[in-house]
Amino acid sequence: MNRYLSTIELEKENMTFNAGHTTIFSATEREPLHGHYYQVFTSITAWVSDNGMKFDYRYYKKRVGELCAQLNQIFLMPMYSPYLQFSQDADYYYFKFNQKTMPFLKEDVKLMPLTNI
């Protein structure tokens, strides 16, 4: 059988989340804290196998839905911003920006391996 590439596109109602963030523009400027409604669309390209399938796409639908659930109703903060320092204690993250400290309950925050959001 000739092998060929094909693309599967996944989009479901559970592939959404609401999350807050702030975009940091410089050492002294940032957006106010605010949130967005995100819809996730996944496109996967792979070789089609002899049975006419690429893979069991149900795994990816489930996994993306689980990731969206983890990000739902959470505040996203970048871990690697050059303008944002953070410390923590047992219950809180303390984010320091432009000489001001913003405390957040740890359960309300997801630290992202990014420089900005």
Question: What is each PLM-predicted segment?
Answer:
Residues 1-117:
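Charge-rich, low-complexity N-terminal segments
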